[in-house]
Amino acid sequence: MEPVTRRTALILGGLGATAVVAGAGGLLWSQLNPFELRMPDGSGADLREPDVHRSAAGVLDVALTAAASTKTIGGRAARVLAYNGTLPGPTLAVRPGDELRIEFANQLSATTNLHTHGLHVSPDGESDNVFRRIDAGESARYRIQIPADHPPGTHWYHPHHHGTAAEQVFAGLYGAILVDDPEARDSLTERLLVISDISLAGSGDVRSASVAERMLGREGDLVLVNGQLAPVIRGRPGEQQRWRIVNACTSRYLDLRLDGQRFDVLGYDSARLERPREAEALLLLPGNRVDVLVTMAEGRSVLTAIPTDRGSFGMMGGVTRSTEPVAVATVAVDGDAVDTPPVTFAASTARDLRRAAVARTRTLVLAMGGGMMGGGMMAFTIDGASFDPDRIDQDVAL
């Protein structure tokens, strides 16, 4: 049997009656969750990577269909939403200067659209227009030009139609976009970890959000990695792996730890660091991405998400926020040790704007109010006005 680290044992043993520990990987989940897990078929399997579609000759042609789908989560059939029937959707890998061509079909029962989160691209024409409507049963074409000077990095795609985006992402509509570095020469093992959360009723349907969750954001009962519960990430002692991590949760902050081991951070979102920076914790807000190097330590470790206060004001007794650590994945390292050659990365190409001249100073007042005590839902305003997609409040020159 592989050794379990002291920190792992403390996590698995210290949660008491409020959590269930199942399987060698240490899956933790709330007893309040009505979705019954059948462990042998679902959790503890090796991490599965999404299918990857790579560009060729400067073009990536891909067809994406958003539709209801039945997937196995924790050994049970779950009725979710998915791109091309997979959770997450296929990974789209492009290079600077490429054109991303997407033939998109909406087979949902609601309006949707597509947003390439993090890409430095235009919203004009058939590109990344978040105000575009693709109604149920309709199809659309996207033509997205990746700038020739686009920095490499990890991004993602998801719906962005106002009023349905959070619900559709929560139900499973998300996938990764990689902008590859044309100068990269390393041969590291790469892992993509798209982390999401979901709540499922006993029927296997996605549970509807409560009033409190709609106001303050909901955190799912189950935390998934590439659509799996507590998968196993394998490696050999001394091996360095590059992990690309996406926080595809709609509200959950991810404060990630790996049994006290260090991460070497390469960059957040599109901001690549000049040199790797050591960190014992990674904090990712919803939509954030991070690229890290992980040196495999022999034995079993647990990648854990520590509860984080995201400012829910203690309303409703804090029911919208998780209060227990969650074992996101197990890292299992065995076999012969390997020596990884030193890895070099190109310097960051991002502009440092901290000393740039300020052309104009603007003051925007963000506020919220209302709620159930006021007889309605929470109202969010900027300069006293609620969001209106047909109104332009600020014009900013590029």
Where are each of the predicted segments found?
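Terminal connector regions
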Residues: 163-166, 299-330
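Residue-level detector of secondary-structure transition/capping positions
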Residues: 17-18, 23
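C-terminal substrate/ligand-recognition segments
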Residues: 371, 387-398
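Disordered, low-complexity segments in secreted/periplasmic proteins that are enriched in proline
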Residues: 315-316, 372-378
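Histidine-centered copper-binding motifs that mark active-site loops
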Residues: 23-292, 298, 327-343, 356-371
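N-terminal secretory signal peptides and thylakoid transit peptides that target proteins
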Residues: 1-17
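C-terminal structured domain segments across diverse proteins
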Residues: 377-387
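A cross-kingdom feature strongest in bacterial/archaeal respiratory oxidoreductases
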Residues: 347-351, 384-386, 393
